[in-house]
Design a protein with these regions (language model features):
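Glycine-rich beta-strand-to-loop/alpha-helix junction loops that act as flexible
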Residues: 1-4, 242-250, 273-275
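Gly/Thr-rich phosphate-binding beta-strand-loop-beta motif of the actin/hexokinase/Hsp70
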Residues: 1-2, 127-156, 171
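Glycine-rich phosphate-binding/hydrolytic loop that grips phosphoryl groups
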Residues: 271-324
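Short, solvent-exposed amphipathic alpha-helical segments in soluble enzyme
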Residues: 129, 258-265
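Phosphate-binding glycine-rich/basic clefts of nucleotide- and phosphate-handling proteins
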Residues: 57, 88, 93-97, 101, ...
Length: 325
């Protein structure tokens, strides 16, 4: 649900020093926060309201500048001025409150808040690949999240409200099953040649994965067409050089091939990413299957150690106040 109301804003920020100064980590963090603040003000201007209540749930720096020249890492360099260009993403206050409330009702607490495309791209597309014009598509249940890299940085985020649940609904209607049975059917079809199930009348069926792929073909075409159109829009009106697909929805047969067709790319330039990008991740369970389903969860875990995008709660006069950390 969060992705459907996500707002993305590009902004700039700069810091002028009184004299030549060695840039510290604190200077860089201050610069980033100035950029986020400028993005927030820009969002308020676009919404034409001073009462806007949006929270920044993540940001990515596109470029840092030292005295006006692009630089990868500012820390330790001497200069008179530092600046940055970044992309900040915001969610409405009520959406963030809803996410926290749902977690708290389960008896848990939120340790970190991030966006799925930010988490996934940090695993699936390492910085050494970001000079290339690549798209990452995280095909989840309700949304397909998209991010674009070019010239060494992440240059755009986007989403479409179409993903794996539409495929599940298609199967449920065709085979007359409930949603959970259809979802299990969808998942099994990506790993087995034949799948057994029962419809709501109790009648047993055994169907091939090829038949299932044929049933959902039109739905897959519709989703991949929307994804391709969004990628082209985010990339300035042209296709990218390659696409990495993660998430469960992208595992359905025909998905990556259809996406390649709509983007006019060779089939080998659109591929699922799984174990190939998690070679340096050690899992405690020996029998865990390392595939595209794990890319985003692993990215979320890594983000917890690397970022500070979360909220803290304090009680003042018996009233709980939420603060952005």
């Amino acid at each position: 649900a969060a992705g459907r109301v996500l707002m993305t804003v590009e902004a700039e920020a700069e810091i002028d020093f009184n004299s030549e100064t060695v840039v510290t980590t604190e200077n860089i963090y201050t610069l980033d926060m100035l950029g986020v603040e400028n993005a927030y003000e820009k969002l308020r201007e676009e919404k034409k309201s001073d009462d806007i209540k949006f929270y920044c749930v993540g940001y990515s720096v596109k470029h840092y500048y030292q005295n006006g020249y692009v630089i990868t890492n500012l820390e330790g360099h001497k200069c008179n001025k530092i600046s940055c260009e970044l992309i900040a993403t915001f969610l409405p206050d009520e959406v963030v409150d809803g996410l926290y409330a749902a977690v708290e009702r389960a008896g848990l607490y939120v340790a970190n808040l991030t966006l799925e495309p930010i988490a996934a791209i940090n695993v699936a597309i390492p910085e050494r690949f970001r000079l290339l014009n690549i798209a990452l598509v995280d095909v989840g249940a309700g949304t397909s999240d998209i991010s674009i890299t070019k010239d060494g940085s992440i240059v755009a985020y986007g989403m479409i409200p179409s993903a794996g649940d539409e495929i599940t609904e298609c199967l449920a209607k065709h085979y007359l099953t409930d949603f959970n049975e259809a979802d299990a059917l969808k998942c099994k079809s990506t790993e087995m040649d034949e799948v057994e199930f029962s419809d709501i009348m109790g009648l047993p069926y055994k169907v091939s994965s090829e038949e299932i792929a044929e049933v959902v073909k039109d739905t897959v075409y519709s989703i991949t067409k929307s994804v391709a159109d969004k990628i082209i829009e985010l990339n300035g009106g042209k296709s990218v050089s390659a696409v990495f697909v993660v998430g469960g929805g992208g595992k359905i047969k025909g998905f990556v091939e259809s996406l390649a067709e709509f983007l006019e790319l060779p089939k080998e330039r659109v591929a699922l990413r799984g174990s190939e990008v998690m070679g340096n991740i050690t899992f405690m369970q020996d029998d865990i299957k390392v595939d595209s389903l794990l890319v985003t969860p692993v990215g979320i875990c890594l983000n917890f150690y690397e970022q500070r995008n979360n909220f803290i709660f304090v009680n003042i006069n018996d009233e709980r106040i939420k603060l952005y950390d």
